[in-house]
UniProtKB/Swiss-Prot annotation:
Matches recorded under PANTHER family: PHOSPHOGLYCERATE KINASE, PHOSPHOGLYCERATE KINASE 1, CHLOROPLASTIC-RELATED
Superkingdom, natural source: Bacteria
Phylogenetic classification of the source organism: Bacteria, Bacillati, Bacillota, Bacilli, Lactobacillales
Protein name per the record: Phosphoglycerate kinase
Pathway linked to the protein: Carbohydrate degradation; glycolysis; pyruvate from D-glyceraldehyde 3-phosphate: step 2/5
Primary location class: cytoplasm
Catalytic activity: (2R)-3-phosphoglycerate + ATP = (2R)-3-phospho-glyceroyl phosphate + ADP
Pfam families attached to this UniProt entry: PGK
Residues holding ATP: 214, 301, 332, 359-362
Subunit structure: Monomer.
SUPFAM superfamilies reported for this sequence: Phosphoglycerate kinase (SSF53748)
Length: 403
C-alpha cells in the first residue's frame, strides 16, 4: 500500500510537526558531518515554501544523565540548519511546556522552529525513558502542538518511539494526517523496492565484521537475489564452514553451523573470497601478503585479494539492481581498504543499474571515491536499512497513513 507523502497534504497555514534525523556527530559544539541535516532540507523547504510552519523534532545521541545534556543539545544543529536554509531558525531549549507552546504560537507561515533533543525526555521523570519507550502521553502532547505530522527520520524508522510512532498514532486518532517526508519516501522507493520487487539480475554485496548482523538479510535475500557477494570479516566464518583454515582471522564460532546451512540453502548464489590479503597483526603497518582461501595459522585475513576483486567485479557485470552494505576489509586502515574501494568503483561503473548503498563504511567509501553522484541512492539508516533488507515491517514507516 502506498504511503501518504508530505506533498499529498495541504500544509498552508498549518503547524507541521516533522520528525527529522539530526543525529549528527558533534564535538565541542562543532558538527563533524552535516549530511543528515542536508538530507532533511527538501522536506523542510517544501513545507515553508508552501506556507506551512515547520516544527522540527529529533534525537541526538543517548541521554543517560543530566551531564549528557550539555554536549547533546540540538542548539548547534539549529544554527547550522539556519545557515543551510539561509533564514533564521528559532531554537527552543526544551521540548515540552510553556516555552515550546509560546514559540509555536508566535510562528508565522514559513517559519522554522527546532525543539530540544527528544531524548532529554528519557531521564528525570516517573515513566522512565518517555521518548525511547514510547510514552503515549508524550506522543499525545507533541501531537497536540501541530495540525500535520511528517516522519522523515529513516534512521530511527526501526524504533517505536514517542516522537515517531507516538505522534503518528495520536495524530491519526485525532483525524489529522501523518505523512512521510521526501527522505523516507526515497528509502521506501529504493530500499523497499530492491527487496520487494527488484529488477534482475539482482546482486547483494554484504560485508562487515559479523555474520550475526547479516543473518536476517542473507536468509531473506537468498530466494530473491541472483548472487550474494560476501566479504569483510564475516567471510571467514563462511570459509571456516567450508573447511578452510582461517588462521587468526575474525570468526564467530557459534555461527559456523548456521553458515553451513546458508551455504547449502544458497548453492552457488553465495560468492565468497577466493584469495585474501593477510597479516600477522591487526595493524595498518603490518607486513601483509596475498594468500588463497586458506590462511596460515599465524596470520589473519584483513582484506579481499586481487583475484577476489576480479571475481566480485565479474559477478556484478550485467546486474540491474545492486544493494551494498558493509566493507570488504578493514576499510579504516588504508593498506586494507583496496577491496572496498575497488568494489565501490565497479558499482559506480555499472550501466543502467539501480545502485543502493547503506552502512557507514560503504557510504564513507563512496564519498572517498567521489562516486556518490553516480549511485542511485545512499541510505541514511544503519540499523533501519538492515532491518528493511531483512524484510521486516519498520514501525516508523508502518505508522504513516496509507494513501
Amino acid at each position: 500500500m502506498a504511503k501518504l507523502i508530505v506533498s499529498d497534504v495541504d500544509v498552508k497555514d498549518k503547524k507541521v510537526l516533522v520528525r527529522v534525523d539530526f543525529n549528527v556527530p558533534i564535538k565541542d559544539g562543532v558538527i563533524g558531518d552535516d549530511n543528515r541535516i542536508v538530507a532533511a532540507l527538501p522536506t523542510i523547504k517544501y513545507i515553508i515554501e508552501n506556507g506551512g510552519k515547520a516544527i522540527l523534532l529529533s534525537h541526538l545521541g543517548r541521554i543517560k544523565s543530566d551531564e549528557d545534556k550539555k554536549s547533546l543539545s540540538l542548539a548547534p544543529v539549529a544554527k547550522r540548519l539556519g545557515e543551510l536554509l539561509e533564514k533564521p531558525v528559532t531554537f527552543v531549549p526544551s521540548n515540552e511546556g510553556k516555552e515550546v507552546e509560546d514559540a509555536i504560537n508566535n510562528m508565522k507561515d514559513g517559519d522554522v522552529v527546532v525543539l530540544e533533543n527528544t531524548r532529554f525526555q528519557d531521564i528525570d521523570n516517573d515513566f522512565g525513558k518517555r521518548e525511547s519507550k514510547n510514552d503515549p502521553k508524550l506522543g499525545e502532547y507533541w501531537a497536540s502542538l501541530g495540525d500535520v505530522f511528517v516522519n522523515d527520520a529513516f534512521g530511527t524508522a526501526h524504533r517505536s518511539h514517542a516522537s515517531n510512532v507516538g505522534i503518528a498514532t495520536a495524530m491519526k486518532a485525532a483525524g489529522k494526517p501523518a505523512a512521510a517526508g521526501f527522505l523516507l519516501e526515497k528509502e521506501i522507493k529504493f530500499l523497499g523496492n530492491a527487496v520487494a520487487n527488484p529488477v534482475h539480475p539482482f546482486v547483494t554485496i554484504l560485508g562487515g565484521a559479523k555474520v550475526s548482523d547479516k543473518i536476517g538479510v542473507i536468509t531473506n535475500l537468498i530466494p530473491k537475489a541472483d548472487h550474494i557477494i560476501i566479504g569483510g570479516g564475516m567471510a571467514y566464518t563462511f570459509l571456516k564452514a567450508q573447511g578452510h583454515n582461517i588462521g587468526k582471522s575474525l570468526v564467530e564460532d557459534d555461527k559456523v553451523e548456521f553458515a553451513k546451512e546458508l551455504l547449502e540453502k544458497a548453492g552457488d548464489k553465495l560468492v565468497l573470497p577466493i584469495d585474501n590479503v593477510a597479516a600477522t597483526e591487526f595493524n595498518n603497518d603490518a607486513a601483509s601478503e596475498v594468500v588463497g582461501q586458506d590462511i596460515p595459522d599465524n596470520e589473519m585475513g584483513l582484506d579481499i585479494g586481487p583475484k577476489t576483486i576480479e571475481l566480485f567485479k565479474k559477478t556484478l557485470e550485467g546486474a540491474k539492481t545492486v544493494v551494498w552494505n558493509g566493507p570488504m576489509g578493514v576499510f579504516e586502515m588504508p593498506n586494507f581498504a583496496k577491496g572496498t574501494l575497488e568494489v565501490g568503483r565497479a558499482l559506480a561503473d555499472l550501466p543502467d543499474a539501480t545502485t543502493i548503498v547503506g552502512g557507514g563504511d560503504s557510504t564513507a567509501a563512496a564519498k572517498q571515491l567521489g562516486i556518490a553522484p553516480k549511485l542511485t541512492h545512499i541510505s541514511t539508516g544503519g540499523g533501519a536499512s538492515l532491518e528493511y533488507l531483512e524484510g521486516k515491517e519498520l514501525p516508523g514507516i508502518a505508522c504513516v497513513s496509507d494513501k
